[in-house]
């Protein structure tokens, strides 16, 4: 899927829209493969699932290297369209094992790759940074 299609996709493209109230959100923290902590907030906005991320340690270094501002929105991969509501998505993040997150720059977009185990199965989940 190209960036434009990803940015314009909605849950109805993948099935039922998530059951959530406007601007409903949950937060959690992950440690990246760079050993820094990242605080994530999952937000529902008009039936689209967005992920907001903020680096807790060395934020100025992160901004300098990537040229992005503090308040960026990340849209979740289609993977999460399978989940019924925000609590299910939050539960997914709190129950996964062996979390490892990495960031890469690709065509001026930041790709967040989350490698983890869910029920002993390796999963690779990617988020794309929205400008």
Segments the model singles out, each with a brief description of its role:
Residues 2-130:
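A structural signal for beta-rich interaction modules in eukaryotic proteins
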């Amino acid at each position: 899927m190209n960036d434009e299609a990803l940015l314009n996709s909605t849950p109805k493209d993948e099935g039922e829209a998530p059951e959530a109230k406007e601007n409903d959100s949950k937060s959690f923290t992950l440690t990246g493969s760079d050993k820094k902590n990242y605080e994530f907030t999952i937000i529902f906005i008009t039936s689209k699932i967005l992920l907001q991320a903020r680096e807790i340690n060395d934020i100025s270094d992160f901004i300098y290297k990537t040229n992005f501002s503090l308040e960026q929105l990340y849209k979740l991969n289609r993977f999460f369209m399978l989940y019924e509501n925000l609590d299910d998505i939050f539960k997914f993040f709190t129950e996964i094992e062996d979390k490892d997150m990495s960031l890469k720059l690709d065509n001026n977009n930041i790709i967040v790759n989350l490698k983890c185990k869910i029920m002993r199965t390796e999963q690779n989940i990617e988020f794309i940074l929205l400008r």
